[in-house]
């Protein structure tokens, strides 16, 4: 192929050394001379690979604690010289400069350092790479002659072409250059976001860049006629679905991912064993228990009909006892997300006659790291950004506003209901009993309609339950409906012009009411 450029000299300077020794060994076997610096050179030499020292080649030592290594004309001229221009080639020959045909660079882990708990400003600043981005941009600019690899994932493609073609093609070099510029753009954006956030004292930055990398193409979107793909956000260090390990099951769909994310978000909000059951991005069941199997039993009983074909989230390792419960006749589950799965549980879930290996099992790892701190949502012409709606209030900050007191036995259910209602589409109403969800009214334009739907779902179980509302009650009509259903206590933000009427209606029916002072709309 006429566009194949042979690789005779390679410059390697990387922070992430995953797969590097094997890659460099392949380059050496292909007759490539390798130049390298500092820790990268030491790593390669320890792996038995011959390496030329950049400091010896440039005649200038590394200095300033490694801040200056490759910033030298002998390096950059060798990268930027155009092979099709005689004066370029004559110039580097006059100065005894070797042309580099391959540059392998990945950058200091700035984003990882910034997201690490306890990282100091000095540590973050020290992870701002200078020479690396310069090398990457130089090689990417001259991609007509130079291949630039910025990720271990690219090593295989480069070696394949060296082995089969003796060099790199224009198509590969162009692709690598595009990925390189995307890499440095995201890197600089992360630094700017950090510096802007620091400068304005925690306000949202004046500009924001969303840097995402496509992980996989999905079969389709919410509907078969819509194209879809999944992109990863390297700045999200919490346990998440994009970096999760799929243990078994069919390919995840767009809707599966949305529902699994909602299921995980609910489960991680509880300290005790918790299970959430999601259908169309709303919970149709949820519960806590002394054990995971108790929690899943209670959660699935919340709305058994809707739970068919649902996805489930858990905040504990899925054990065999829980798996045995899920394998009972009549249950069908699309997917399960959990920190981990016992081997016996996987065996049960993947050999159930009706399921076989179709159920998708997603292992996300420990839930120690908090979930994302901000939420982002695209609208026409821009993006909305807000703090994530995390629960920071506690019963100590709440206020019982009725003369009717809250029975001590109801506080666990009240706290559970208040945690759950923020996960339901507004107008949102939930009924809870025995720390389990027994009725959900979601997404209605009228609050009283949501109340009536939740009561209908709970049926006779509503007797002795508590009701949680994501926003205030504009009229007492919802209280009348709750009283007929046997609700004993209601928790809501308060703030209506008719709060007095609502409170009076509660006292009339001997229902306790708690104000939290915090609304939890979800649109």
From Swiss-Prot:
Known EC number: 2.1.2.3, 3.5.4.10
GO BP: 'de novo' IMP biosynthetic process
Pathway info: Purine metabolism; IMP biosynthesis via de novo pathway; 5-formamido-1-(5-phospho-D-ribosyl)imidazole-4-carboxamide from 5-amino-1-(5-phospho-D-ribosyl)imidazole-4-carboxamide (10-formyl THF route): step 1/1; Purine metabolism; IMP biosynthesis via de novo pathway; IMP from 5-formamido-1-(5-phospho-D-ribosyl)imidazole-4-carboxamide: step 1/1
GO MF annotations, alphabetized: IMP cyclohydrolase activity; phosphoribosylaminoimidazolecarboxamide formyltransferase activity
Classification via CDD domains: IMPCH (cd01421)
MGS-like domain mapped to chain residues: 1-150
GO CC field: cytosol
SUPFAM superfamilies: Cytidine deaminase-like (SSF53927), Methylglyoxal synthase-like (SSF52335)
InterPro entries: AICAR_Tfase_dup_dom_sf (IPR024051), Cytidine_deaminase-like (IPR016193), MGS-like_dom (IPR011607), MGS-like_dom_sf (IPR036914), PurH-like (IPR002695)
Family of the protein in this entry: Belongs to the PurH family.
Notes on the domains: The IMP cyclohydrolase activity resides in the N-terminal region.
Protein name in UniProt: Bifunctional purine biosynthesis protein PurH
Gene from which this protein is expressed: purH
